[in-house]
Amino acid sequence: MKSVTLKELSLLLDGVVQGDETLVINSVATLEHATSGQISFLANSKYRAQLESTQASAVLLSAKDAQDYQGTALVVKDPYVGFARVAQLLDTTPKAAMGIHPSAQIDPSAQLGDGVAIGANAVIGANVILGENVQIGAGTVIGQDSIIGSNTRLWANVTLYHNVHLGQDCIIHSGAIIGSDGFGYANERGQWIKIPQTGGVRIGDRVEIGANSTIDRGALGHTEIHNGVIIDNQVQVAHNDIIGENTAIAGSTTIAGSVTIGKHCIIGGNCAIAGHLTIADGVHLSGATNVTGNMREPGLYSSATVAMDNNLWRKNTVRFRQLDELFQRVKAIEKNLNTPE
């Protein structure tokens, strides 16, 4: 079990200890469930009541919240960021693989850096390059001519098609498929003609891709996911999309082909983005937003209908269908009112 003193944490987080700085911390927990030896945090005032009753040995607090707290605290600028840093430090998540399993199938042309680990029944294709300390989980398949940067971790049953490049310090979760064909077809007299998808996928450093997400390869050029992007579970990224640095995309979102999303965007869950659009830096889409046009300015955008009583929803649905008729009636009334007698 890992452990660290509050004094050591204060140096890591540039914080100030309020209480016993020799106190030893071995894990993190919520205010409600923390016990001795654990550190918790208060980042939302609605949990203030739990602060008074917590059994945590120490709590990460802002300077304001620490003023009236009688227990041991580590005062930091942002308690939630502090919690994330401590959680990383004390993380006990097992590795995706240890050593190279004898059942792994590794092409002789593949290049493996120092410290590479490959799990059972994994397949490493021709001309693949794995950087130092890469972890390849059991059953994962890496297609030919792919490159994976150092310290990147692929969990079990990930599939990388050919010509996929991953940067350093990435995490790819189970079931993710990267580099499958984009949805490219031409229609000739009612029959679909497949367009070979000859591009690849280029993923930067510190990217995390959630379970069962799919990222299509480019039709001609590459699909690009830039540094620091985080993608939740069950997200679809289509061919030739470009996602800017440090953008976050929540689960069940679908992005059609040839979309360019800027830097530092937040895309809520279950959003749908039509193809060939541009979304500016700093755009925030709330959950279930349907994007059908370019977004040139940063800001918060929404389009989903919120939940309501079913009977009210039925009435409003009927009224929505009558909007055009109502508009024409109002327009006619206005015209008559403005007509001189």
Swiss-Prot record:
Active site: H239 (proton acceptor)
Pfam families cross-referenced by the UniProt entry: Hexapep, Hexapep_2, LpxD
GO cellular component: membrane
Entry protein name: UDP-3-O-acylglucosamine N-acyltransferase
Keywords tagged on the record: Acyltransferase, Lipid A biosynthesis, Lipid biosynthesis, Lipid metabolism, Repeat, Transferase
Family (UniProt): Belongs to the transferase hexapeptide repeat family. LpxD subfamily.
Gene Ontology annotations of biological process type: lipid A biosynthetic process
Function as written in the Swiss-Prot or TrEMBL entry: Catalyzes the N-acylation of UDP-3-O-acylglucosamine using 3-hydroxyacyl-ACP as the acyl donor. Is involved in the biosynthesis of lipid A, a phosphorylated glycolipid that anchors the lipopolysaccharide to the outer membrane of the cell.
